[in-house]
Protein backbone atom coordinates (compact mmCIF):
# COMPACT_ATOMS: atom_id res chain seq x y z
CA UNK A 1 0.00 0.00 0.00
CA UNK A 2 1.03 3.59 -0.48
CA UNK A 3 1.19 4.52 3.19
CA UNK A 4 4.08 4.30 5.61
CA UNK A 5 5.02 1.08 7.30
CA UNK A 6 4.31 1.02 11.03
CA UNK A 7 6.94 1.61 13.71
CA UNK A 8 9.32 3.94 11.84
CA UNK A 9 12.06 5.64 13.87
CA UNK A 10 11.07 8.93 15.53
CA UNK A 11 10.83 11.76 12.97
CA UNK A 12 13.98 13.85 12.69
CA UNK A 13 12.18 17.15 12.24
CA UNK A 14 8.78 18.78 11.94
CA UNK A 15 8.73 18.52 8.16
CA UNK A 16 9.32 14.76 8.21
CA UNK A 17 6.56 14.29 10.78
CA UNK A 18 4.13 16.37 8.72
CA UNK A 19 4.98 14.43 5.55
CA UNK A 20 4.30 11.14 7.34
CA UNK A 21 0.94 12.50 8.50
CA UNK A 22 0.12 13.65 4.96
CA UNK A 23 0.77 10.13 3.66
CA UNK A 24 -1.88 8.80 6.04
CA UNK A 25 -4.58 11.15 4.70
CA UNK A 26 -7.25 9.20 2.85
CA UNK A 27 -6.34 5.85 4.44
CA UNK A 28 -8.97 4.00 6.45
CA UNK A 29 -8.45 2.92 10.05
CA UNK A 30 -8.95 -0.67 8.88
CA UNK A 31 -6.08 -0.43 6.39
CA UNK A 32 -3.77 1.06 8.99
CA UNK A 33 -4.76 -1.46 11.67
CA UNK A 34 -4.13 -4.34 9.27
CA UNK A 35 -0.72 -2.94 8.36
CA UNK A 36 0.17 -2.57 12.04
CA UNK A 37 -1.38 -5.96 12.95
CA UNK A 38 -3.62 -4.33 15.51
CA UNK A 39 -7.06 -5.66 16.40
CA UNK A 40 -9.87 -3.20 15.71
CA UNK A 41 -12.14 -2.66 18.73
CA UNK A 42 -15.89 -2.98 18.23
CA UNK A 43 -16.29 0.67 19.18
CA UNK A 44 -14.30 3.38 20.94
CA UNK A 45 -16.32 3.52 24.19
CA UNK A 46 -13.76 1.45 26.09
CA UNK A 47 -10.86 2.23 23.75
CA UNK A 48 -10.92 6.02 23.51
CA UNK A 49 -7.20 6.29 22.81
CA UNK A 50 -7.11 3.58 20.13
CA UNK A 51 -7.10 5.87 17.08
CA UNK A 52 -4.30 8.01 18.50
CA UNK A 53 -2.29 4.92 19.43
CA UNK A 54 -2.71 3.53 15.90
CA UNK A 55 -1.53 6.76 14.27
CA UNK A 56 1.41 7.04 16.69
CA UNK A 57 2.65 3.70 15.34
CA UNK A 58 2.89 5.17 11.84
CA UNK A 59 4.26 8.55 12.89
CA UNK A 60 7.04 7.30 15.19
CA UNK A 61 5.78 8.74 18.51
CA UNK A 62 7.56 7.59 21.64
CA UNK A 63 6.05 9.40 24.65
CA UNK A 64 2.84 7.37 25.06
CA UNK A 65 0.69 8.96 27.76
CA UNK A 66 3.54 10.53 29.72
CA UNK A 67 3.25 14.22 30.69
CA UNK A 68 5.66 15.21 27.92
CA UNK A 69 4.56 15.77 24.35
CA UNK A 70 4.09 12.85 21.94
CA UNK A 71 7.17 14.02 20.02
CA UNK A 72 9.29 15.52 22.84
CA UNK A 73 12.37 16.04 20.66
CA UNK A 74 10.29 18.24 18.36
CA UNK A 75 8.05 19.77 21.06
CA UNK A 76 4.94 18.55 19.20
CA UNK A 77 1.75 17.00 20.59
CA UNK A 78 -0.45 14.71 18.43
CA UNK A 79 -4.21 15.25 18.66
CA UNK A 80 -6.71 13.21 16.66
CA UNK A 81 -10.06 14.93 16.30
CA UNK A 82 -13.25 13.10 15.24
CA UNK A 83 -15.24 15.16 12.74
CA UNK A 84 -18.64 14.95 11.05
CA UNK A 85 -19.38 15.12 7.31
CA UNK A 86 -19.22 18.93 7.46
CA UNK A 87 -15.74 18.82 9.03
CA UNK A 88 -16.94 19.94 12.48
CA UNK A 89 -15.57 18.37 15.69
CA UNK A 90 -17.86 15.79 17.29
CA UNK A 91 -16.41 16.01 20.78
CA UNK A 92 -14.20 18.06 23.06
CA UNK A 93 -10.43 17.47 22.96
CA UNK A 94 -8.58 16.22 26.05
CA UNK A 95 -5.46 18.28 26.82
CA UNK A 96 -4.06 16.99 30.11
CA UNK A 97 -4.93 16.04 33.68
CA UNK A 98 -5.51 19.05 35.95
CA UNK A 99 -3.36 19.37 39.09
CA UNK A 100 -5.73 19.72 42.06
CA UNK A 101 -3.09 20.22 44.79
CA UNK A 102 0.35 21.86 45.05
CA UNK A 103 -0.59 24.79 42.84
CA UNK A 104 0.87 27.70 44.79
CA UNK A 105 2.94 29.87 42.47
CA UNK A 106 1.92 28.00 39.31
CA UNK A 107 1.64 30.26 36.25
CA UNK A 108 0.21 29.94 32.75
CA UNK A 109 3.71 30.21 31.27
CA UNK A 110 4.86 27.07 33.12
CA UNK A 111 1.57 25.15 32.93
CA UNK A 112 1.07 21.70 31.40
CA UNK A 113 -1.80 23.05 29.29
CA UNK A 114 0.40 25.66 27.62
CA UNK A 115 3.21 23.12 27.18
CA UNK A 116 0.88 20.58 25.55
CA UNK A 117 -0.72 23.13 23.22
CA UNK A 118 2.46 24.99 22.20
CA UNK A 119 2.67 23.00 18.94
CA UNK A 120 0.00 20.49 17.91
CA UNK A 121 -0.29 18.12 14.97
CA UNK A 122 -4.05 17.89 14.45
CA UNK A 123 -5.27 14.87 12.49
CA UNK A 124 -9.01 14.88 11.73
CA UNK A 125 -10.65 11.44 11.52
CA UNK A 126 -14.16 10.59 10.34
CA UNK A 127 -16.11 10.06 13.53
CA UNK A 128 -19.79 9.65 12.71
CA UNK A 129 -21.19 6.58 14.42
CA UNK A 130 -22.93 5.18 11.35
CA UNK A 131 -19.51 4.72 9.67
CA UNK A 132 -17.99 1.41 10.87
CA UNK A 133 -14.71 2.04 12.66
CA UNK A 134 -12.63 0.14 10.08
CA UNK A 135 -14.05 2.28 7.25
CA UNK A 136 -13.41 5.67 8.84
CA UNK A 137 -10.83 7.66 6.93
CA UNK A 138 -8.00 9.91 8.04
CA UNK A 139 -8.14 13.56 6.99
CA UNK A 140 -5.43 16.05 6.04
CA UNK A 141 -3.14 17.01 8.93
CA UNK A 142 -2.60 20.48 10.33
CA UNK A 143 0.42 21.76 12.28
CA UNK A 144 -0.77 24.48 14.63
CA UNK A 145 0.45 26.83 17.33
CA UNK A 146 -1.95 29.20 19.11
CA UNK A 147 -1.87 32.74 17.77
CA UNK A 148 -1.84 35.67 20.21
CA UNK A 149 -5.63 35.83 20.42
CA UNK A 150 -6.02 32.07 20.97
CA UNK A 151 -3.28 32.03 23.59
CA UNK A 152 -4.94 34.91 25.45
CA UNK A 153 -8.31 33.08 25.48
CA UNK A 154 -6.65 29.89 26.74
CA UNK A 155 -4.67 31.75 29.40
CA UNK A 156 -7.75 33.59 30.68
CA UNK A 157 -9.77 30.39 31.02
CA UNK A 158 -6.87 28.48 32.58
CA UNK A 159 -6.30 31.20 35.18
CA UNK A 160 -10.01 31.36 36.05
CA UNK A 161 -10.23 27.58 36.47
CA UNK A 162 -6.99 27.33 38.44
CA UNK A 163 -8.12 30.13 40.77
CA UNK A 164 -11.28 28.14 41.53
CA UNK A 165 -9.20 24.99 42.20
CA UNK A 166 -6.77 26.83 44.50
CA UNK A 167 -9.62 28.53 46.39
CA UNK A 168 -11.24 25.16 47.12
CA UNK A 169 -14.13 25.45 44.66
CA UNK A 170 -13.24 22.51 42.42
CA UNK A 171 -16.60 20.82 43.07
CA UNK A 172 -18.45 23.93 41.89
CA UNK A 173 -16.76 23.98 38.48
CA UNK A 174 -19.01 22.83 35.63
CA UNK A 175 -18.29 22.21 31.94
CA UNK A 176 -19.90 25.62 31.27
CA UNK A 177 -17.02 27.47 32.95
CA UNK A 178 -14.48 28.80 30.47
CA UNK A 179 -14.93 30.20 26.99
CA UNK A 180 -12.61 27.79 25.14
CA UNK A 181 -11.18 25.56 27.87
CA UNK A 182 -13.25 23.47 30.27
CA UNK A 183 -12.51 21.36 33.33
CA UNK A 184 -14.44 18.18 33.93
CA UNK A 185 -14.11 14.78 35.64
CA UNK A 186 -11.76 12.33 33.96
CA UNK A 187 -12.11 8.85 35.42
CA UNK A 188 -13.08 5.48 34.03
CA UNK A 189 -15.13 4.86 37.17
CA UNK A 190 -16.46 7.00 40.01
CA UNK A 191 -14.40 5.12 42.62
CA UNK A 192 -11.08 6.51 41.34
CA UNK A 193 -10.75 9.50 43.67
CA UNK A 194 -7.86 11.92 44.09
CA UNK A 195 -6.94 14.53 46.69
CA UNK A 196 -8.00 18.15 46.26
CA UNK A 197 -8.54 21.26 48.39
CA UNK A 198 -11.97 21.86 49.96
CA UNK A 199 -13.78 25.14 50.56
CA UNK A 200 -12.31 25.49 54.07
CA UNK A 201 -8.81 24.67 52.83
CA UNK A 202 -9.11 21.09 54.08
CA UNK A 203 -8.03 18.04 52.03
CA UNK A 204 -10.95 16.37 50.24
CA UNK A 205 -11.33 13.43 47.88
CA UNK A 206 -12.84 14.12 44.48
CA UNK A 207 -12.84 12.73 40.95
CA UNK A 208 -9.70 13.49 38.91
CA UNK A 209 -10.27 16.39 36.52
CA UNK A 210 -8.99 17.00 33.02
CA UNK A 211 -8.65 20.11 30.86
CA UNK A 212 -10.54 19.88 27.55
CA UNK A 213 -10.74 22.20 24.54
CA UNK A 214 -14.33 23.08 23.70
CA UNK A 215 -15.71 22.17 20.27
CA UNK A 216 -16.27 25.84 19.42
CA UNK A 217 -12.51 26.45 19.74
CA UNK A 218 -11.32 23.43 17.73
CA UNK A 219 -14.12 23.93 15.18
CA UNK A 220 -13.04 27.52 14.50
CA UNK A 221 -9.41 26.40 14.31
CA UNK A 222 -10.17 23.71 11.70
CA UNK A 223 -12.48 25.99 9.72
CA UNK A 224 -9.85 28.71 9.52
CA UNK A 225 -7.19 26.37 8.19
CA UNK A 226 -9.27 24.13 5.97
CA UNK A 227 -11.97 26.61 4.91
CA UNK A 228 -14.59 24.08 6.00
UniProtKB/Swiss-Prot annotation:
Q: Name one GO biological process term.
A: mismatch repair
Task: Classify the source by domain of life.
Answer: Bacteria
Q: What is its main location?
A: cytoplasm
InterPro entries in the cross-refs: DNA_mismatch_repair_MutH, DNA_rep_MutH/RE_typeII_Sau3AI, DNA_rep_MutH/T2_RE_sf, Restrct_endonuc-II-like
| Any one GO CC term of the record | cytoplasm
Record localization: Cytoplasm
A Pfam family that this protein carries is MutH
- State its role: Sequence-specific endonuclease that cleaves unmethylated GATC sequences. It is involved in DNA mismatch repair.
| HAMAP family, per database record | MutH
Protein name listed in UniProt: DNA mismatch repair protein MutH
Amino acid sequence: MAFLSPLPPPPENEQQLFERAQQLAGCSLGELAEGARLAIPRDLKRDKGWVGMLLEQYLGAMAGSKPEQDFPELGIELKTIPIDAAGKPLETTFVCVAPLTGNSGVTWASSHVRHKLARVLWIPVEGERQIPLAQRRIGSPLLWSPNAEEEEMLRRDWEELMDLIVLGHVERITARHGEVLQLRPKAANSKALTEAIGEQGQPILTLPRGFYLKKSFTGALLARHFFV
